[in-house]
């Protein structure tokens, strides 16, 4: 009965959230811009009040604080740090947006995602790609495929690339294990970049036919980087992320019971010392970036706080309202009857499209670890077969690209694109792009790698 009540509540929260995100910016864009915070408060109350009535106020407060302190705080600080540092790096030169250059930029950005994270790569490459294609009219497809590849799929090779893999690393999966996903990544890149090239070639020819021409910059180098020293601060942030997965395993950061030490907040909620260290390093990197970079670089980048503010407000509501669904998953995950790699791939991916992919990954990794396999990858949760772990990893990382809310960089890229006059698809419009181009690729992934 409790599970039924929780399930009904979670479905209502998810439905209301998605409808609000999808419809309100289209029907009342001015209202949405002014009242995002009110909408978030409403979503949160729709979860908190029934939850408090059913489980008690202390449990409701603990659940919300656990979500905000344990998940949201480090999440938004990481986004903030990368947003600040990347905003102080400007790539410029004589490169102009055409199909070949765009394919190369997307390919490079995709590989960068595994080196500095999908968020870091997105924030680093989004502005140059927008600027290179500023002369073009037909360009929304460029940013959609940017989200597909750079903001999501490219993060599959290392725990730095995407938080679910970092969660796997903290549960005993070796740091370089995810390099096994390289063939899957290459196949996806080939398929999606081929599709993109043909789409971009048609759009490019339309722009040329209409008389649009890029500005030719004479005596300009092919690529010039302003604020290149900020790459050091990106390295600082990457180190902070790695430490967040390494430090909790060390005995120096554990008490006698083996729990990670930290500052008690409320009941079982604790702000851990490794999280504090991660936050401090990231904020220091952001501060140093602003202190050591001339303001003119940010001006040339058209740097504003609008995108990060929108994401911060939006995702605090998402993190809170997804809690009932995650609770149902944790309690019923082992009874879902999902036992094969291809089932794990689609189940993890479908939920990662609308919920935070990190806890979703953990739920299915825990489920797989509890199946008493005798061969595979040894984790702290149990033995998980290689193919099943590949399926869970790919589902969580790849299918965050299915919606704007599947992964934080998605909405950041959308917001920055909107700020720069690119008419991005609506919430459901973007899902239609995913259905046309991503799902067929994922079906091919399933047939080749997970059956």
Whereabouts are the PLM-identified features?
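Membrane-interfacial helix-loop connectors
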Residues: 50-52, 113, 124-138, 142-144, ...
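Single conserved hydrophobic/aromatic residue that forms the stacking wall/gate
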Residues: 1-9, 14
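Juxtamembrane and boundary regions of transmembrane helices in multi-pass small-molecule transporters
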Residues: 138, 157-158, 176-225, 398-451
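Hydrophobic mid-bilayer segments of alpha-helices in multi-pass membrane transport proteins
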Residues: 11, 15-21, 35-52, 72-84, ...
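Transmembrane helical segments that form the transport core of multi-pass membrane transport proteins
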Residues: 236-363, 367-370
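Intrinsically disordered, low-complexity non-transmembrane regions of multi-pass membrane transporters
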Residues: 10-11, 45-46, 199-234, 252-266, ...
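Interfacial loop-to-helix junctions that mark the boundaries of transmembrane helices
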Residues: 10, 31-40, 61-73, 175-184, ...
